[in-house]
């Protein structure tokens, strides 16, 4: 693994997607925030509209270095990490996190990792169930304005704190989100235990920090359904994925993939301090 600093891999100042559990286990608060990487084990999160984070609250921050990138190869060769941390200090518009655990991926390999002494991955004894099938009978009209946004960030309900991952996606004009993965992945297993999730589309393919601080993004929350291969919608969506992301044609055509439909309950606005 590399000896490079986290900021060398990700960048010193990036956009992040932060997720934390609310007062109830079934609630998740999700923010788009600025991130200053202070060290390999410390982040400063910046919230232009304020936040509701508290000292000692566990927060997961998705980090990657894809700002300004709109094309990828099949191995997704960008540095990316699901940074799990603890809030150590706050102001009205900022919060500092101390790292609990993270792994930085590049392609399919781990380039850098950290975990505090004594950390163990939390056991998850929630039962897995088959996802309900999507009610769609035909592919919806897709949102062409999101064509430059090749990948977004999926936040799922893991034990203790959320899990984040980047996903190639399609979005409809009705805020449906579609994504594809293998059923053996950690995110797929989490969805089989709780099919609620959040999906953030942050526009970082065309983002610069010099632009207006009110960043162009949306956060979709809802329930995930499976689109079975027997459904007439499956090949329609599959072809649309290949058109949007031809660099992943081999993956989208793999016989073992599972296709998911996030049916939006609402578009989540950024959490603000009241």
PLM segments and residue spans:
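Binding-site signature for planar aromatic cofactors or substrates
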Residues: 1-274
């Amino acid at each position: 693994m590399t000896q490079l600093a986290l900021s060398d891999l990700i960048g010193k100042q990036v956009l992040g997607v932060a997720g934390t559990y609310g007062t109830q286990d079934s609630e998740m608060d999700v923010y788009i925030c600025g991130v200053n990487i202070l060290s390999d084990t410390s982040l400063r999160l910046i919230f232009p509209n304020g936040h509701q984070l508290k000292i000692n609250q566990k927060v997961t921050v998705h980090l990657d270095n894809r700002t300004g990138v709109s094309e990828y190869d099949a191995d997704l060769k960008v540095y990316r990490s699901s940074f799990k941390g603890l809030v150590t200090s706050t102001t009205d518009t900022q919060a500092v996190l101390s790292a609990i655990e993270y792994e930085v991926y590049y392609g399919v390999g781990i380039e850098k990792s950290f975990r505090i002494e004594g950390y163990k991955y939390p056991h998850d004894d929630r039962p897995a169930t088959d996802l309900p099938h999507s009610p769609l009978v035909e592919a919806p009209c897709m949102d062409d304005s999101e064509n430059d946004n090749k990948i977004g960030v999926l936040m799922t309900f893991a034990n203790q704190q959320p899990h984040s991952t980047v996903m190639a996606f399609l979005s409809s004009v009705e805020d449906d989100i579609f994504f594809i993965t293998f059923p053996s992945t950690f995110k797929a297993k989490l969805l089989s235990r709780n099919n609620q999730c959040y999906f953030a589309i942050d526009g970082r393919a065309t983002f610069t920090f010099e632009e207006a601080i009110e960043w162009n993004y949306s956060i979709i929350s809802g329930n995930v359904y499976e689109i079975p291969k027997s459904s007439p919608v499956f090949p329609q969506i599959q072809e649309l994925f290949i058109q949007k992301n031809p660099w992943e044609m081999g993956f989208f055509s793999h016989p073992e993939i599972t296709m998911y439909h996030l049916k939006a309950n609402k578009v989540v606005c950024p959490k603000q301090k009241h």
